Amino acid sequence: MTVRLREKYQKEVVPALMEEFKFKSIMQVPRLVKIVVNVGVGEAVQNAKAIEAAVNDLATITGQKPVVTRAKKSVASFKLRAGMPIGAMVTLRGDRMYDFLDRLCSLALPRIRDFRGVSRSSFDGRGNYSLGLREQIVFPDIDYDKIDKIRGLEVAIVTSAPNDEQAYALLKRLGMPFRD
């Protein structure tokens, strides 16, 4: 079973990008490399159960078991010691990556209050795109009654595009709702 977005990429996006940027080879066409989803859980310093809830939410959203991230340095003002769990992260590749991006663009982003599109200025200059979501409940997979706290999450989309222009063209054709 192929993922809907991967099929769209191969059948529609690749030929369109080859024509737009005058690529000679299919291998020059930008593609998605990975999507990294991260949740920072600052309250995990006082409440150890907060990290478990964040891990469960992230696993539900992405369909993959997250890695618990730990503090690299101790910070006295935050009452934080090196090695304490302070977040969770998932790296998505392959079919799961395309499935997640499809659900993000078609289901989650339109459910955000007062949503007019994502910013074009969030590219990093090397063809990667980052966006933050204020609440995890925009994903339909999350049961509103079972969440303990509304948490935000960061999504980093890594592409093989050498510049922002090509990455924008790729994401726009894959269905990312940009604010124009």
UniProtKB/Swiss-Prot annotation:
InterPro entries per record: Ribosomal_uL5, Ribosomal_uL5_bac-type, Ribosomal_uL5_C, Ribosomal_uL5_CS, Ribosomal_uL5_dom_sf, Ribosomal_uL5_N
Pfam families reported for this sequence: Ribosomal_L5, Ribosomal_L5_C
Keywords: Ribonucleoprotein, Ribosomal protein, RNA-binding, rRNA-binding, tRNA-binding
Record GO cellular component, one term: cytosolic large ribosomal subunit
Domain of life: Bacteria
Function: This is one of the proteins that bind and probably mediate the attachment of the 5S RNA into the large ribosomal subunit, where it forms part of the central protuberance. In the 70S ribosome it contacts protein S13 of the 30S subunit (bridge B1b), connecting the 2 subunits; this bridge is implicated in subunit movement. Contacts the P site tRNA; the 5S rRNA and some of its associated proteins might help stabilize positioning of ribosome-bound tRNAs.
Family, similarity comment: Belongs to the universal ribosomal protein uL5 family.
Name of this protein: Large ribosomal subunit protein uL5
